[in-house]
Amino acid sequence: MNTLTSPRPGPAPAHEAQANGPTAPPGRGRLVNDAPMRMFHWLFALSFVGAYLSADSEHWRLVHVVLGYTVAGLLAFRVVYGLVGPRPYRLSTMGRKVSGAWAWLQTVRAAWTPGGAQPTVAWRQAPVFLMAVSLVALLAVVLPLTLTGYGTFHEWGGDWGGEVFESLHEFFGNTALSLVGVHLALLAGQSFWRQKNLALPMLTGRLEGRGPDLIAHNRVWLAVLLLLCVLAYLGWELVIAWR
């Protein structure tokens, strides 16, 4: 081998290392999800599943309502965290991904148009864009889902209005469930394609492989605070129900 044509790469400049974040030690993986986002994810998932399963039972109606309000509160946290949190979780970052998905669809359309420019389509980007769109759509549908549920519970508009709100609430609930299914299917498909468990980082926060951490700080304290706020709200509702 000619060693002159394959020089050993030197260390990255200091400013590049700071921009990319600290490099994960071998065997630990890269930090890609911080503790608050993981806590939000699982509280949101459990609250949504619990609310959906208790939707058709009059006996568990209060549980359904309380868990629905919990989902709405978690959405509020996600919006705030999307404004002041780490860059990967910013709403602007999500917006750019959705815009990228639209641009990608335009590329696909141009590639399938006879006599067009026939651009090269990056098919590997499809799951990434679909994942981003499904997550944004899921978060967006929570607001009308909560509002229609609130209107149903408080019987806005009398009997006629209650039926309308109930139908809309059921529609948005099924839409949200469908988006959850799309999210899980994309996650499973990407995990199979890349031969990596892409769901594991939402538990451990780390993704297998070497490279810089995407998140500089884990912020365990904020995750604990979020959990305590949710538990305090559930406890408060429980005390009121017993009175």
Regions found by a protein language model. Give the residues of each.
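Membrane-embedded alpha-helical bundles that constitute the cytochrome b-like, heme-associated redox core
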Residues: 1-243
